[in-house]
Amino acid sequence: VEGVRWEKKLGNFDIRDSMWDSLTNLGIGPAMGITAENLAERYQISRKEQDELALLSQQRACRAVDEGKFKEETVPIEVKSRKKTVLVERDEYPRKDASLEALSKLSASFKEDGTVTAGNASGMNDASSGVILASEEKARELGLPILARIISTATVGVEPDIMGIGPVEAVNKALKKAGLRLEDMERVEINEAFAAQYLACEKALNLNREITNVNGSGISLGHPVGATGTRIITSMIYELLRERKRYGLAAICAGGGMGTAMVLEALQKEEQEERSHV
């Protein structure tokens, strides 16, 4: 609510939706959905391709939830009301009933002849996330397990009207700094802000979908602004540890045209113990 810090004697109060800034490219460009439409046109991504990707995301997320893959990285929350207390232990967003038929019936959300719909875009939901980021020396001093180490990071900027392609150059830059190739990555997380946005990045980077977003992403798990970056990094670390893999790559786009990427090395239990006693 604007103008309430100081006394306002006459006139109306305007209530502003702060989320809208995040959905309109920080006021300097088109709505986020239009940027996805722009990428769909530029990279010739069809509605069918977007819906198929959305369905795959839902299927992967539902399978991961059923297999308990997120339990290690999530904290149950008690929600109290007057009548009862509910323990929330799993995400409510993944849709087991998702189907291509249902997805194909949805109307375009951002322009009349568009291809971006509520079904092939990320969900707006609430979440919080956190990690402990420390030097190896400090982690050893505190006796903390070292799950992974950051090898490199990179942040770049692209034109706001195609903001979703930001991860591409960020990935290339982060890999170069790390002295590694995309082929060296054993798990990849590229947030699905929109199916069109992810597919544009997939085409530009020639991503291997078999190792990318293997447990779902923004379309199926939701995209809580401000928490997604930590979420995809944490999920990737636990997936690398489960599968006894080493290198991972995570990247995300951001309103205004930023793209950020990080290359990580997961440390298996024996490596964690070795480092904690160095």
Protein language model features and the residues they cover:
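Flexible glycine-/small-residue-enriched beta->alpha junction loops
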Residues: 1-38
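Condensing-enzyme catalytic core mediating Claisen C-C bond formation in acyl metabolism
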Residues: 20, 99-165, 169, 176-177, ...
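Internal helix-turn-beta structural module
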Residues: 182, 199, 203-204, 208-212, ...
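A glycine- and small-aliphatic-rich helix-loop capping segment at beta-alpha/alpha-beta transitions
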Residues: 1-14, 137, 204-209, 264-277
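Cysteine-centered functional microenvironments
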Residues: 39-46, 51-53, 112-124, 154, ...
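Active-site pocket-lining segment
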Residues: 34-37, 73, 81, 151-220
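N-terminal extracellular/periplasmic Venus flytrap/periplasmic-binding protein-like
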Residues: 49-141, 146, 204-211
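Active-site-proximal alpha-helical scaffold in enzymes
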Residues: 1-2, 40-69, 131-137, 202, ...
